[in-house]
Every structure is written in structure tokens, then in C-alpha cells.
Design a protein with these regions (language model features):
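Predominantly five- to eight-bladed beta-propeller fold
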Residues: 1-39, 81-82, 122-146, 235, ...
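Predominantly a core beta-strand signature of beta-propeller blades
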Residues: 42-45, 92-95, 154-157, 199-202, ...
């Protein structure tokens, strides 16, 4: 676990700003890793120093701790670096796996502790996972997955040619597969990746947007929950061996009792540069095709896709219930459509995005 230590304070007469983030509360505080022995009751501090230390993982046999530090570097992209260390909790020997590496977000142990599953962007490990056009700058919000061998210090890209954005992953102890939660266009889906041959397979699961999942360690069982374009959350169990799904609890049936929604239709168009832009529209309940309705166009100005979830801050059905047709789309620069598509967001300043939104609205 980690404990926060309060950092040094400036005197009352003068403030020294060490860097831009020093203006934020708590910037000088530091987090360090401690261990508590349940048998002896001993508290022991494992890390200290100038930088924060973060727990990444503990090996299955509890012998090794994987922890990292990060440092700011405003002279080059992505303006931060990551160092990863493997601590032997018996001998207290530290193995430095990499220092001041860029574009790496974190790592976890494989079930046998011999490899690492590393999260980062395509630029990590000297660009081995990069898949963009010449002249583009990668979108670091587009997550990629790597295998790293601590013995050889070599890494392998697992998702270089995989379009969905990997947001999280778990390495199953039971079947040895890596289960990845992804942004897959306007869906959130779970895929498996075979770490031996790199083969990726999508799990055929109910619900458009899966929020979270949990894997059993000693059985072919996964629990997950999610929702879709016109229903709230439902909880399921999934057998990873025979691929069968069972509904455990339908929260949506309780929450949406006596609520009527309008229809939702997918609608894509091809922009002037030949790009297919994905979108959908929502109709009011009791929609009358002979009438004219005002239309609301919703788009997110960031880089994440507007997914198919029913419940979020700007629910499309809520606006449709007020008598509007609601159109939403995922223009160039959105994650979940491949690295090249996501990279269009960088230094674009909305020019291409605005054109596509206008084109879709007019069509």
C-alpha cells in the first residue's frame, strides 16, 4: 500500500514555483510504498526519495513487487517518462527493468511471473507498436499492449494492427489468455489475445458497452456488467470454455419500468476525403414520419468515442423525449478506430472535425 508524505513548503514571504504543476495543491507531496506483515504486525517502508512511487503489481507467489516512478520532461513529447523496477521482497534486491522510458503507462506480471504485460501507446519501446502515416504524431490516448521479457529486455507489440483502443487488460491464470477491455468504435467490447501467437478474438457478449469484468483464477468463469443503447446495466456470467452467457441480474428491468424510448438507428456517411464517419440518430417516442422535428447534434470535442451507453451526462434519449431528433457521430481523431484515425486529433485544432460534423448534419 502507499502512504502520502507532505512535501516542503515555501516561506511566508516568497513563493518559488518549481514548474507549472507546482501551482496545484499537493504537487510537492509524495507517495511511497509500505508493507504490513500480517503475522508479525511489522510496518516497513519499501521506497523513498524525490519521486512518487506507484505499485503496478505483485507476483502471484507474492515474492516480487513491480513498481514505477514518473518524471516530467517539458522539452519533448510526451512530457513525461516512466521507470520500472522489480523488487525481490525476500532479498530486497532491485532489478531496474527500464529507466526514463517514454510512452509507457504501467505493467503487470504474467501468471508465472516470467513476463510483463505493458500498457502504453504505439511509440513505446522505440515505436515497435506504431501504426500511423508518415508525418502524423500518435494520439497517446490510443492504448496499445506489449509483452516484455525481463530476462532478455526485449518487448513485442501485441496490438499494432488491432484497431480498438485497449483501456485495460487481465492475464488469466486459468487459460493463459489476455482479456482486453476495449473501445471498439462506439462499442466497449472484450477481446482475448493469445500471448504465444498473438491471435486476437472478440467475445460474443450481450450489451453494447461493457464497463468492467472479473476473471476467476481456477475456473473458466468471468463476470461482467454493461448496458446498451436503450437499456441500463445488466450483470452476466460467462463461461470462457464453452462461450455461454447467463444473465445474473437485470437492473435495467427495475430502473426502466414503464419508461418508453424512441427508436435508435445507425447512420454512417462518407466525408469529402473518403473517410467513413460513424454515427447514429435517436427518434422521439411516438415518432411521426409525416411531421418535421428539430434536431440536436451532439459530439464530443475530445478524443474518446461517444459510445452507445444509455446512461451518461448527456443521454440522447433524454433529449429525444423532449421532441428532438438527436444525431451523434464520431469524427476523425476518435480513439477506437485505429491508430491512424486517432492520430488525426493531434494538432488538428478541430478543423477537420468541424468539417465532418457539418457534412454529417447537412446530409
Amino acid at each position: 500500500y502507499t502512504i502520502q508524505e507532505e512535501g516542503p513548503k515555501d516561506g511566508p514571504d516568497m513563493l518559488r514555483i518549481l514548474e507549472p504543476n507546482d501551482r496545484l495543491p499537493g504537487f510537492r507531496n509524495r507517495y511511497f510504498i509500505w508493507r504490513y506483515d500480517l503475522q508479525t504486525g511489522l510496518y516497513e517502508q519499501l521506497t523513498y526519495g524525490h519521486n512518487n512511487t506507484f505499485i503496478n503489481d505483485v507476483s502471484a507467489d507474492s515474492r516480487y513487487l513491480l513498481f514505477s516512478t514518473s518524471e516530467q520532461d517539458y522539452t519533448s513529447l510526451p512530457h513525461s517518462s516512466n521507470s520500472m523496477y522489480k523488487l525481490d521482497l525476500q532479498s530486497m534486491a532491485v532489478d531496474t527493468l527500464w529507466e526514463k522510458a517514454q510512452y509507457i503507462n504501467g505493467a503487470t506480471f504474467s501468471p508465472d511471473g516470467k513476463q510483463l504485460m505493458v500498457f502504453g501507446s504505439g511509440n513505446a519501446f522505440d515505436n515497435i507498436g506504431l501504426n500511423i502515416k508518415e508525418g502524423q504524431i500518435s494520439n497517446t490516448y490510443d492504448g496499445q499492449l506489449f509483452l516484455y521479457d525481463p530476462a532478455t529486455r526485449k518487448a513485442k507489440a501485441l496490438t499494432k494492427d488491432f484497431n480498438p483502443n485497449v483501456t485495460s487488460a487481465q492475464w488469466s491464470k486459468f487459460d493463459g489468455q489476455i482479456y482486453m477491455l476495449t473501445e471498439d468504435q462506439d462499442y466497449q467490447r472484450i477481446y482475448t489475445c493469445n500471448p504465444v501467437n498473438g491471435k486476437i478474438r472478440r467475445l460474443d457478449l450481450p450489451e453494447d458497452v461493457i464497463y468492467n469484468y472479473s476473471l476467476a483464477e481456477t475456473a473458466p468463469v468471468m463476470y461482467y456488467y454493461g448496458q446498451s443503447v436503450s437499456n441500463a446495466n445488466r450483470l452476466y456470467s460467462y463461461n470462457t470454455k464453452n462461450n455461454k452467457t447467463q444473465l445474473i441480474y437485470d437492473l435495467s428491468a427495475d430502473k426502466l419500468k414503464d419508461i418508453k424510448f424512441g427508436e435508435v438507428h445507425d447512420w454512417n456517411f462518407t466525408s469529402t476525403d473518403g473517410t467513413v464517419i460513424q454515427g447514429r440518430y435517436y427518434l422521439p417516442p411516438n415518432f411521426d414520419a409525416s411531421r418535421k422535428y428539430p434536431m440536436i447534434v451532439y459530439y464530443y470535442g475530445g478524443t474518446s468515442p461517444t459510445n452507445r451507453a444509455l446512461e451518461f451526462s448527456y443521454s440522447m434519449h433524454m433529449y429525444a423525449a423532449l421532441g428532438y431528433v438527436v444525431y451523434t457521430l464520431n469524427p476523425s481523431g476518435t480513439t477506437g478506430f485505429g491508430q491512424e484515425f486517432a492520430a488525426r486529433h493531434v494538432n488538428a485544432w478541430g478543423d477537420k472535425t468541424a468539417d465532418e460534423i457539418i457534412q454529417g448534419t447537412e446530409q
